[in-house]
C-alpha cells in the first residue's frame, strides 16, 4: 500500500492523452476475379476460324445475312494471279477480230468444264444471286459460311484442274491482256485508234520466236492466242513505246508469277492445303500463306493464324516484310522479342551503324540495348 494513494495530484492538460479511436486506413481491394478474366486471352480469332471450318465441313448454314453486301473472299482462280498486278477487264479492241473468234470457243469450253465440275459437287455460291428465283428474297445473300464453303469447293476444283494442266494458261492469258492494255494507255496521242493497231500486230510476232520452224501452208489454221500472244513488241511501231530488238524481255520477269503460284499450290500436300484454305478465305494472300507455312512447318490452324496475325501487326507498324519474317524466325516466332529487335534495329540504323552488324550484336546480347550499343560503338572506333 502506497502512502500517496489518497493525495490528489493536479496534472496539466497537455499531458492528458485523448482516448478517441483513430479511423482505420482506407484500403481498396481490387476485383481479382475481374482482373484475371480481363488478362486472359479469349482466342476469338482462332475460335471463329475453327467454327467456320467446322460449319463449312458439315454443310451450308440455314441462316442467311439480312444485310446486302459483297462476298468476303474472291473467286479461287484469282488466287493464282500475282498480288503485285491489279486485275482489270481485258481489252477487247486490241485483239484481232479473227483471233478473238478463235479464242472464244476455248474459253467457253473451259467455262462449261468448270460449270460441270462445280455442278457435280455442289452449286457455287455465285449462282445464288439476289435476283434469282432460288434466293429467298431480293435483298438477301448467302452468309460468309456459305461463301467459305464455295471457296473450298473452288479450291478443290482448282487443284484437280491444276493436276491435269488446264488452269495455268487462263491467268497467263489474262495477264498478257492486261499488259497490252497498259502499253496502249502509256501512249499520249489519243488520235491513234486501237483497232488500227490490231491488223499489223501478228506480223512482227513470227521473227520474235526464232526457235519455232516456219509453218507449211498445209498445216491448217493458226492456233489461237494461247500460242501467239500479243506482246509489247507487236504494238511498238504504232505506239509511243520504243521497239524491242529480240524476244519480249519485259514480260519475262513477270511471266513466272502465275506459274510460281500454281507450282506452289500443286506441290503442297493435302494436309497443308487444308491449313491454307481457311487462311486464304480469311483474306490473307495465297503467296504469303504458303511462305508462312514453309517457315513454320505443319502446325495447327490456331498456331498458323497466330503467326500470320503477329506478322501483320508488325507490318502495320511500318517495318519491311522481309525484316519481319527474319526477326520472327530468329526469335522462334516470339512477337514480343521480334518487335523489340525491330525497334532497336531501327534506332541503331538511324545512328549510322551497319545493318548486318546490328543484327549480329542484338542476337548475341538478346536485345539488351546498353550492351549492344557499347559493342557497336567499340567496333566503330
UniProtKB/Swiss-Prot annotation:
Looking up CDD domains in the UniProt record yields:
UBA2_UBAP1_like
One GO CC term of this entry?
Answer: ESCRT I complex
Pfam families per the UniProt record, alphabetical? UBAP-1_UBA2
The cross-references to InterPro entries, in alphabetical order and at most eight, read:
UBAP-1-like_UBA2, UBAP1, UBAP1_C, UMA
Query: What is the protein's given name?
Result: Ubiquitin-associated protein 1-like
Ranges of compositional bias, category Acidic residues: 105-123
Task: Cite the GO molecular-function annotations of the record.
Answer: ubiquitin binding
Amino acid at each position: 500500500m502506497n502512502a500517496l494513494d489518497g493525495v490528489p495530484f493536479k496534472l496539466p492538460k497537455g499531458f492528458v492523452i485523448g482516448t478517441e479511436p483513430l479511423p482505420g486506413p482506407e484500403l481498396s481491394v481490387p476485383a481479382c476475379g475481374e482482373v484475371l478474366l480481363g488478362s486472359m486471352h479469349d482466342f476469338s480469332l482462332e475460335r471463329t476460324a475453327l467454327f467456320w471450318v467446322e460449319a463449312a465441313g458439315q454443310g451450308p448454314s440455314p441462316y442467311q445475312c439480312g444485310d446486302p453486301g459483297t462476298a468476303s473472299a474472291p473467286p479461287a482462280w484469282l488466287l493464282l494471279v500475282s498480288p503485285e498486278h491489279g486485275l482489270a477487264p481485258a481489252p477487247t479492241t486490241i485483239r484481232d477480230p479473227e483471233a478473238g473468234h478463235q479464242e472464244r470457243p476455248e474459253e467457253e469450253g473451259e467455262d462449261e468444264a468448270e460449270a460441270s465440275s462445280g455442278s457435280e459437287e455442289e452449286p457455287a455460291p455465285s449462282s445464288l444471286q439476289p435476283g434469282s428465283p432460288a434466293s429467298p428474297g431480293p435483298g438477301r445473300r448467302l452468309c460468309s459460311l456459305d461463301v467459305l464453303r464455295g471457296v473450298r469447293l473452288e479450291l478443290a476444283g482448282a487443284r484437280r484442274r491444276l493436276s491435269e494442266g488446264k488452269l495455268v494458261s487462263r491467268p497467263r492469258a489474262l495477264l498478257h491482256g492486261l499488259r497490252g492494255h497498259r502499253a496502249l494507255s502509256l501512249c499520249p496521242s489519243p488520235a491513234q485508234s486501237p483497232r488500227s493497231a490490231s491488223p499489223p500486230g501478228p506480223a512482227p510476232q513470227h521473227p520474235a520466236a526464232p526457235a519455232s520452224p516456219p509453218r507449211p501452208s498445209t498445216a491448217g489454221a493458226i492456233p489461237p492466242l494461247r500460242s501467239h500472244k500479243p506482246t509489247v513488241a507487236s504494238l511498238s511501231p504504232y505506239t509511243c513505246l520504243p521497239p524491242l530488238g529480240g524476244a519480249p524481255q519485259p514480260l519475262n520477269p513477270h511471266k513466272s508469277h502465275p506459274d510460281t503460284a500454281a507450282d506452289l499450290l500443286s506441290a503442297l500436300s493435302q494436309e497443308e492445303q487444308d491449313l491454307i484454305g481457311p487462311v486464304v478465305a480469311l483474306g490473307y494472300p495465297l503467296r504469303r500463306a504458303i511462305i508462312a507455312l514453309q517457315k513454320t512447318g505443319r502446325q495447327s490452324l490456331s498456331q498458323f493464324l497466330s503467326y500470320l496475325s503477329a506478322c501483320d501487326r508488325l507490318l502495320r507498324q511500318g517495318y519491311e516484310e522481309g525484316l519481319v519474317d527474319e526477326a520472327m524466325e530468329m526469335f522462334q516466332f516470339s512477337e514480343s522479342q521480334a518487335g523489340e529487335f525491330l525497334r532497336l534495329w531501327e534506332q541503331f540504323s538511324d545512328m549510322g551503324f551497319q545493318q548486318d552488324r546490328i543484327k549480329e550484336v542484338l542476337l548475341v546480347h538478346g536485345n539488351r540495348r546498353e550492351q549492344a550499343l557499347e559493342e557497336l560503338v567499340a567496333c566503330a572506333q
